């Protein structure tokens, strides 16, 4: 699957839960305090990510484009949008961010943290039911988070439908310090 094949009106999907690995990194860097159980889970997500390899072949048949989430959801979605010359609308309430991040109002970590190694893909609406069936497989979580649109903007709406302003887009390999 290519990054450059997202089509207008495709659904946008992600696998798994986002933000755990970024929490693990923040914990190891002593930037955050976490409850013991979450700390262990977060560090585990960073050090041994659970790759969704069991569904790659199935998704290849149902999807137009895909990328793994290594730089953060928004950064990696931006790679698809740029390569496909399209835009997107994302619903923040639908993004499967680690519940602790939502509870502590740290949702940006789940959107831009990186190292999740989950799959981000676009698929035609006609495949929605098939993808939902795949998501019922044991240990597979797939969530629809938005849609592809004409244009080049990426809009993230909050739970009230208002535009959400993200502080950091994600990891930049060429960022100068």
Positions of PLM-derived features:
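Helix-biased detector of long, well-ordered alpha-helical tracts
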Residues: 1-177
